[in-house]
Design a protein with these regions (language model features):
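Glycine-rich adenosine-cofactor-binding loop
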Residues: 13, 103-108, 115, 122-150, ...
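Phosphate/diphosphate ligand-binding glycine-rich loop within oxidoreductases
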Residues: 3-120
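Generic structural signal for residues in well-ordered beta-strands
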Residues: 38, 153, 172-173
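Conserved N-terminal Rossmann-fold NAD(P) cofactor-binding segment
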Residues: 160-173
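Alpha-helical structural signal in soluble globular domains
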Residues: 72, 76-79, 144, 148, ...
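Short beta->alpha hinge that forms the Motif I/post-I loop of the SAM-binding pocket
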Residues: 43, 158-159
C-alpha cells in the first residue's frame, strides 16, 4: 500500500520567524495523519520574484503570503482569482495540477467570520468602522466590509498618504 503524496507548504514573508502558522498547520497535519509539512520561508524584499517561481521546482503544493509581499505577489503568479484581483492583494498561492500558480485572498473572509463568531448579530452597516493599518490585509478587510454593506470605513495609518491612496482606490475621496 502506498502512502499519500507528500504535501509541502509554507509561509513567505519578511520577517517570518514570529509566524505561528507553521505550528498551527503542522499540528493539524499531524493530528489528522496527513503526510506533509508547513515551513517558514523568509524571503527578503527584492527576492520575491525569484522565490515564487521556485515553489514549483521545490515541490511545494502552495504557500501563504504575509507582509510585506501581499501586493507584489499578485504580479508573480499565472492566475489571480477575482476576489484577490478586486482586493489588490493575495495571501495564498496554490500550485495547480498543471504546475501553474494561482493566487487567492481569504483575509477578508477570515476577518468577517471572526466578527460573526464573536458577535453573531454583527452588521457592517450598523455604524462607522475603523480599520487600523493600510497594508495587504487591510485591503482585504476594507473590501469585505464594503461588500457587507459598511457605510463608513475610517482608515487609520502611520502615513496619511497610504491611507488616502487606499481610500481613493476603494472609491472614497
Amino acid at each position: 500500500m502506498s502512502s499519500p503524496p507528500f504535501g509541502l507548504a509554507g509561509i513567505i514573508g519578511w520577517p517570518v520567524a514570529h509566524s505561528r502558522s507553521p505550528s498551527l498547520h503542522n499540528y493539524w497535519l499531524q493530528k489528522y495523519g496527513l503526510n506533509g509539512v508547513y515551513v517558514q520561508l523568509p524571503v527578503a524584499p527584492g527576492m520575491l520574484a525569484i522565490a515564487i517561481p521556485g515553489l514549483k521546482a521545490l515541490g511545494f503544493r502552495g504557500c501563504n503570503i504575509t507582509l510585506p509581499h501581499k501586493v507584489d505577489a499578485l504580479q508573480l503568479v499565472d492566475e489571480v482569482d477575482a476576489t484577490a484581483k478586486r482586493m489588490g492583494a493575495m495571501n495564498t498561492i496554490v500550485v495547480q495540477p498543471d504546475g501553474s500558480l494561482k493566487g487567492y485572498n481569504n483575509d477578508g473572509y477570515g476577518y468577517i467570520q471572526s466578527l460573526l463568531d464573536a458577535q453573531p448579530d454583527w452588521r457592517a452597516d450598523a455604524g462607522p468602522i475603523a480599520v487600523l493599518g493600510c497594508g495587504g490585509a487591510a485591503r482585504a478587510v476594507v473590501h469585505s466590509l464594503a461588500d457587507r454593506g459598511a457605510k463608513e470605513i475610517r482608515l487609520l495609518n502611520r502615513t496619511n498618504a497610504k491611507a488616502q491612496a487606499l481610500a481613493t482606490e476603494f472609491g472614497s475621496p
